[in-house]
Design a protein with these regions (language model features):
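Short, surface-exposed alpha-helical segments at coil->helix boundaries
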Residues: 55-59
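Short, solvent-exposed loop/turn segments at secondary-structure boundaries
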Residues: 48-53, 116-120
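A secondary-structure boundary/capping signal
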Residues: 40-41, 77
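Short helix-loop-beta-strand segments that form the rim/entrance of peptidase-like active sites
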Residues: 70-80
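Structural cue for short, hydrophobic secondary-structure segments
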Residues: 39-40, 108
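Active-site metal-binding loops of divalent metal-dependent hydrolases
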Residues: 42-43, 81
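Cell-envelope and extracellular/periplasmic
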Residues: 4-16, 78-89, 100-119
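N-terminal secretory targeting modules
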Residues: 1-39, 45-52, 62-72, 91, ...
Length: 121
C-alpha cells in the first residue's frame, strides 16, 4: 500500500501568529515563576517508540525548559495517547490539558491524521 504525503501549503492551515504569549511565558520562567508545559498528541508525543520515557520529544522539550530557566518551577504534562487523531485530541484537550492551565502547549498529530477530505478541512 502506497501513501501519498505530499501536502501543498495552500491546502493546509498555516498560522505564524505572534510571539507575544511565548515571550510572556519565557519572561515568567526567567523571573522564576511556575511554568506548566503540556504536550497533546499521539504515540510520538506519548513516546511509545522511544528507548525510555525520558527520550521522547515531549520530555526533551520539558528538559530544555528546565535547563534554560533553572530558577523556574517547570512542570510537565504528557497527554500523548497512541493511535489517536486530532479529532480525538479536540475531544479530550479540555480534560487532559486545559484544566491544568498550561503556559506552554505543543500539539502533534502528524502520523494519525489521514490524508483525506475530513482532515484537510
Amino acid at each position: 500500500m502506497s501513501m501519498d504525503y505530499n501536502i501543498k501549503a495552500e491546502d493546509g492551515v498555516i498560522n505564524k501568529g505572534n510571539l507575544y504569549r511565548l515571550k510572556k511565558c519565557m519572561k515568567k520562567a526567567l523571573n522564576g515563576g511556575p511554568v506548566i508545559t503540556a504536550f497533546l498528541g499521539g504515540s510520538i508525543t506519548q513516546g511509545s517508540l522511544a528507548s525510555d520515557s525520558e527520550k521522547c520529544y515531549a520530555y526533551l522539550v520539558y528538559k530544555w525548559w528546565k535547563k534554560k530557566f533553572p530558577a523556574a518551577d517547570v512542570s510537565f504534562i504528557n497527554a500523548g495517547v497512541g493511535g489517536t487523531t486530532s479529532q480525538y485530541g479536540v475531544a479530550r484537550v479540555e480534560d487532559h490539558v486545559l484544566r491544568y492551565r498550561p503556559d506552554f502547549v505543543l500539539t502533534e498529530f502528524a502520523v494519525n491524521d489521514k490524508n483525506d477530505e475530513f482532515f484537510k478541512k
